[in-house]
């Protein structure tokens, strides 16, 4: 197998801890996973193209969950912090996610992600598409 073939395969940054989990992976931005994920969330082709043009290798956080009775204990902070470290080690230049504002949460998830340095660059199905440049 050639090195180029290895780098085209997604690298998992998924993790599960007691009380929560995060699902994500790192891919080259010209691979179909980025387009497929953002399209399925309702992102415009302009948003997708701008990400692909800015970053060659990108991490995608598809899903994060913290058990309701464990929220407020730092589990989400640890999951995102570990995902940022894993993405950086895997060569990602940025992390992209769609902040789920439709979910019933006691906190503003968009502001919470902004606390890590994520910035909104567009929307997908009415939810913010957020990017953290590494």
Where are these predicted regions, by residue range?
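Conserved N-terminal entry element of GNAT/NAT acetyltransferase domains
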Residues: 1-19
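Short beta-strand micro-motifs in enzyme catalytic cores
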Residues: 11-13, 57-59, 128-130
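Conserved acyl-donor/pantetheine-binding loop and adjacent beta-alpha core of acyl/acetyltransferases
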Residues: 16-60
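Residue-level recognition of the GNAT/N-acetyltransferase active site
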Residues: 62, 67, 100
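Conserved acetyl-CoA-binding loop-helix of GNAT-fold acetyltransferases
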Residues: 66, 72-85
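Conserved short alpha-helix immediately C-terminal to the canonical SAM/SAH-binding motif I
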Residues: 79, 105, 109
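Conserved GNAT acetyl-CoA-binding A-motif
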Residues: 87-102
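Conserved catalytic-core motifs of GNAT/GCN5-like acyltransferases
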Residues: 98-99, 110, 114-131
